[in-house]
Swiss-Prot record:
EC number(s) per entry: 2.7.7.60
Origin species: Prochlorococcus marinus (strain MIT 9312)
SUPFAM superfamilies: Nucleotide-diphospho-sugar transferases
Pathways per UniProt: Isoprenoid biosynthesis; isopentenyl diphosphate biosynthesis via DXP pathway; isopentenyl diphosphate from 1-deoxy-D-xylulose 5-phosphate: step 2/6
Family to which the UniProt record says this protein belongs: Belongs to the IspD/TarI cytidylyltransferase family. IspD subfamily.
Transferase is among the record's keywords: yes
Record site: Transition state stabilizer: R13, K20
Database matches in HAMAP family: IspD
Protein name: 2-C-methyl-D-erythritol 4-phosphate cytidylyltransferase
Catalyses which reaction(s): 2-C-methyl-D-erythritol 4-phosphate + CTP + H(+) = 4-CDP-2-C-methyl-D-erythritol + diphosphate
Length: 226
């Protein structure tokens, strides 16, 4: 399975002053823990990191001790542009791809394999969890407009998996139509193409704030042999 990791997080909400994937987590960078999980999945055979040139040396340095090579791909101005760059950099024989947020360093390798396997029956899959909170839709003035039925609400995660040719086509059409999205599954939705949900875990958080980092430290401590 070919695997792309967008890794251009600025770390502004973390107040880190650097790419948040370079922040220390129990003696290693965030991207190290993400790569550790990715390479622990039996389906993984090719990995590309998509990032900004200024971070290339440090990000690849975090990958140097893994047995598998990590390929570098220059990112764009947005996540959407970066993923499209990643797709164009895949080997010509790549038929399927998983795309995973670099900041989701707690991903279970078994879920990665599950996503990969489901691409044998589906052209697009994403990990997601059932929403447990009551969600409110509000107007521009902060007043509640409605409460959607949470039985139909899922919180999207990554990896998100796709047939490569299909996703390339979706990105090309998005450029033509000037569509802006924050994840690749949204492109499929806009084109009325089916995306299969695979139930994920609540521990697969995206590290975006200092409290997220504290949670991640607890998980890493409990999963790392002393």
């Amino acid at each position: 399975m070919h695997f792309l990791i967008p890794a251009a997080g600025s770390g502004s909400r973390m107040k880190a002053g650097k790419n948040k994937l370079l922040i220390d987590l129990e003696g290693e960078s965030l991207i190290y823990w993400t790569l550790k999980s990715v390479f622990s999945a039996s389906s993984t055979n090719w990995v590309g990191i998509i990032g900004q040139p200024k971070d290339k040396e440090l990000l690849l340095n975090s990958a140097k001790n893994f047995a598998h090579k990590v390929h570098w791909i220059n990112g764009g101005d947005t996540r959407q542009e970066s993923v499209f760059n990643g797709l164009k950099a895949l080997p010509k024989d790549a038929e399927k791809v998983l795309i995973h947020d670099g900041a989701r360093c707690l991903i279970n390798p078994e879920l990665i394999d599950q996503c990969a396997n489901q691409l044998d029956q589906n052209e697009a899959v994403i990990l997601a969890t059932k929403v447990t909170d009551t969600i409110k839709i509000v107007d521009n003035e902060g007043f509640i407009k409605e409460t959607p039925d949470r039985n139909y609400l899922w919180a999207a995660q990554t990896p998100q998996g796709f047939l490569v040719d299909r996703l390339k086509k979706a990105h090309t059409m998005a450029i033509d139509k000037n569509w802006k999205v924050t994840d690749d599954a949204s492109l499929f939705e806009m084109l009325n193409w089916k995306v299969k949900i695979i139930e994920g875990t609540y521990s697969n958080i995206k590290i975006t704030s200092p409290i997220d980092l504290k949670i991640a430290k607890l998980f890493v401590k409990n999963s790392t042999p002393s």
